[in-house]
Each structure stands twice: as C-alpha cells, then as structure tokens.
C-alpha cells in the first residue's frame, strides 16, 4: 500500500472578513432556477448569495445561513425567499482524478442542515 501524499490544501489564510479565494472557489447564486433545477434538485429553501461565506478570525471558512423575514432576499422557486446561505464550488478551478478528499467541518443540528 502506498503512502498518502498531500497534493492540495486550502487553509483560508486570509484576513478576517475576506471572501474565499476566487481563483479556487466559485459561487452558485440564486435558488437553482437559472440552472434548470429549482431548489437545487432537493427542495432547498435558501437562496444563495455572495454575502454568506467569509473567512473568520481563526482563518476558517464560515458559511452562514440567515433567516430573512423582510423579503429582502428576493424570490425563490416557492415564493419570497425566507433563507439565504452560500454555495461554493471548485468546478473548473481545482481538479482531482483519483484519491481521497478530507474535510474538517462543523455543522449545527437542525432541519435542512447537512
């Protein structure tokens, strides 16, 4: 069995409040309707925005879900959006053909969180 070799890492060593590095991370915005998959294919209730992902003071990526009650998030496939969040992807930016991907994450308990 061969020894594992690290070929890429993302440590988020950016100033607090910074957006994730756009040379690595792209954002999907909206509710999926623009991609032909309203609710992103699994009835997600949030609308993805540019404001809900940032680097915190511990150099960690923070993705924040926010409840919206004033209609300021715009419309979702089901009506006025009630939640905003962020959707980050590495599509067309970082590639892996084989191997193992490891991530350390903290996710709170609750409906719709995974």
Where are these regions (language model features)?
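Conserved kinase catalytic-core segment
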Residues: 114
């Amino acid at each position: 069995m061969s020894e594992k070799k690290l070929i890429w890492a993302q440590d988020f060593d950016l100033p607090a409040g910074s957006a994730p590095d756009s040379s690595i991370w792209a954002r999907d915005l909206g509710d999926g309707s623009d991609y032909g998959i309203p609710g992103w294919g699994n009835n997600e209730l949030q609308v993805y925005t540019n404001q809900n992902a940032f680097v915190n003071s511990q150099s960690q990526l923070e993705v924040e879900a926010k409840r919206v009650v004033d209609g300021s998030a715009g419309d979702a496939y089901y009506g006025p959006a009630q939640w905003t969040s962020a959707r980050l992807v590495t599509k067309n930016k970082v590639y892996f053909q084989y191997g193992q991907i490891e991530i350390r994450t903290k996710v709170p308990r609750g409906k719709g969180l995974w």
